[in-house]
Curated annotation (Swiss-Prot):
Gene Ontology cellular-component annotations: ERMES complex; SAM complex
Annotated membrane topology: Multi-pass membrane protein
Subunit annotation: Component of the ER-mitochondria encounter structure (ERMES) or MDM complex, composed of MMM1, MDM10, MDM12 and MDM34. Associates with the mitochondrial outer membrane sorting assembly machinery SAM(core) complex.
Gene that this polypeptide is encoded by: MDM10
Pfam families with a match to the protein in the record: MDM10 (PF12519)
Membership in a protein family: Belongs to the MDM10 family.
PANTHER family the UniProt entry points to: MITOCHONDRIAL DISTRIBUTION AND MORPHOLOGY PROTEIN 10
Organism, as annotated: Paracoccidioides lutzii (strain ATCC MYA-826 / Pb01) (Paracoccidioides brasiliensis)
UniProt-listed InterPro entries: Mdm10
Stated name of the protein: Mitochondrial distribution and morphology protein 10
Sorted UniProt keywords: Membrane, Mitochondrion, Mitochondrion outer membrane, Transmembrane, Transmembrane beta strand
Notes concerning its domains: Lacks alpha-helical transmembrane segments, suggesting that it resides in the membrane via beta-sheet conformations similar to those predicted for other outer membrane proteins and porin.
GO biological process assignments: establishment of mitochondrion localization; mitochondrial genome maintenance; mitochondrial outer membrane translocase complex assembly; mitochondrion-endoplasmic reticulum membrane tethering; phospholipid transport; protein insertion into mitochondrial outer membrane
Subcellular location(s) of the protein: Mitochondrion outer membrane
Length: 450
């Protein structure tokens, strides 16, 4: 489950009409959400609030083993009037990343002017709603106790196709009397719909980097030729994207290089009852280290998704195999009120196979719209989610996240073979030299937002 400030930051992207999916950094976002999720390792409490449409705060306290905390503040020039901020109203699917549906490339939408107050009473309009002010976000977090760390984030939408991001991190050792060390990361994003590019510079070893992503197919910036009706009747069914990244540090003489491909089905490909399930395939290569990784993610039903990853290194001949899944659950009362046909758990299967449903009256348009769109109703209907992943070494992580009354709970456990460094002479060792198997971590995280 992402933090409340991350949720507000995503709401800022949506309000400013910035497409965060058209980036090489998010090439494997679906597989990462299903396979690389983290579990809480201790007790953690988060108290958050969106006190005004422009200002949010978060207080965090962690315990078990050690006590620490953080204080976060966030300000945005775009009013987030339509963003649910109470923990009882926040859509759970907005907080828990899962299968991410890719949409056809489109022309970047001009960020809304601040004088667009449609539906907003004049009494709640603030002085920050200046038509000359560009969409901007300011975020600062102070981590306590020592070593004290201060992080800051500045995001500004410079134009409809360009966005600037500045991130700073400053830390100071507990007993050090010297000036705090600070690192600045500058990123410039450029998105045209057809392709996207990212330039970055970090003061840490003077690191320079570039990322790019190219979408094959028609260019959304160019007008379609021929009959517009025929163009609408033949929508894109899939999207193939290719990209890469390169890094170089003149100080440490470090070079980094990677490239990748992504093939994903689009919503138009799965609207037909006889079509396949939505899926995403990715292939990433790192030539310098000889690493190769492939992922396959499948949305088997509106509430069930699977993902797998296979990695291989041509130099060391080491391999990695990971599999995971997520299962969403919702209460029967909400299912019957919002989606009457969803009471039958096999309705979606009959719909995909084209078999008429005689037991329950199914509305195909209603079911398909729920299957593919991340609407507020489907988000509210989801009460909890279970995630499980396992690799070839039998490292298992299980995570449950859901809503309990006014609280958002995240509970997880990690199991796996213990490392030899943590084994004592009395620790049992399995035949063949295998180490013992047991608990690695258990934790609970609680979030309350008002």
């Amino acid at each position: 489950m992402c933090d409340f400030m991350d949720y507000i930051q995503l709401a800022f992207y949506d309000a400013s009409k910035w497409n965060r999916d058209n980036s090489y950094s998010r090439l494997t976002t679906t597989a990462n959400a299903l396979l690389d999720f983290s579990t809480p390792e201790r007790l953690k409490v988060n108290l958050s609030s969106l006190s005004t449409p422009h200002f949010a705060t978060t207080y965090t306290l962690g315990t078990v083993g050690l006590i620490d905390g953080s204080i976060s503040y966030l300000f945005t020039t775009i009013p987030l009037h339509n963003t649910p901020s109470r923990s009882s109203l926040i859509p759970l699917r907005k907080l828990v990343p899962g299968y991410r549906q890719i949409y056809p490339p489109s022309i970047p939408i001009e960020y809304p002017t601040a004088n667009d107050h449609s539906g907003i009473p004049a009494a709640v309009r603030s002085k920050a709603d200046n038509p000359k002010m560009k969409p901007t976000l300011l975020h600062a977090t102070l981590h306590l106790p020592p070593p004290t760390t201060l992080t800051g984030l500045f995001i500004c939408r410079l134009s409809s196709t360009t966005q600037l991001s500045l991130a700073v991190c400053s830390s100071r050792a507990p007993a050090s009397k010297s000036a705090p060390q600070a690192t600045l990361l500058t990123q410039i994003f450029h998105d045209t719909g057809k392709y996207s590019s990212e330039f970055l510079f970090s003061t840490d070893n003077a690191l320079l980097g570039f990322k790019g992503l190219w979408n094959f197919g028609p260019d959304p910036r160019k007008p379609t030729r021929g009959d517009p009706a025929s163009q609408r009747s033949r929508p894109l069914l899939s999207l193939l994207s290719a990209g890469g990244e390169v890094y170089y540090s003149p100080v440490s003489s470090v070079v980094g290089l990677s490239t990748g491909l992504r093939f994903a089905t689009l919503p138009a490909a799965t609207e037909n009852a006889h079509s396949a399930f939505p899926y995403t395939l990715t292939l990433t290569l790192t030539p310098l280290t000889g690493s190769m990784s492939t992922t396959y993610s499948l949305l088997a039903s509106p509430n069930l998704a699977f993902s797998s990853r296979f990695g291989f290194n041509v130099y060391s001949w080491e391999s990695e195999m990971v599999a995971g899944c997520e299962l969403w659950r919702r209460s029967k009362s909400k299912s019957q009120n919002i989606y009457p046909s969803a009471v039958d758990n096999l309705a979606w299967a009959r719909l995909k196979m084209g078999v008429p449903d005689t037991a329950v009256s199914v509305n195909p348009e209603h079911e398909l719209s729920y299957f593919h769109k991340e609407g507020h109703n489907s988000s509210h209907a989801s009460d909890s989610v279970i995630k499980v992943r396992v690799d070839q070494s039998w490292n298992i992580r299980a995570l449950w996240e859901g809503r309990v009354k006014e609280l958002l709970i995240s509970a997880g456990v990690a199991l796996g073979p213990a490392s030899r460094s943590t084994l004592s002479y009395a620790s049992p060792v399995a035949p063949g030299g295998l180490s013992s198997y047991g608990w690695k971590s258990v934790g609970v995280s609680v979030l309350y937002a008002s």
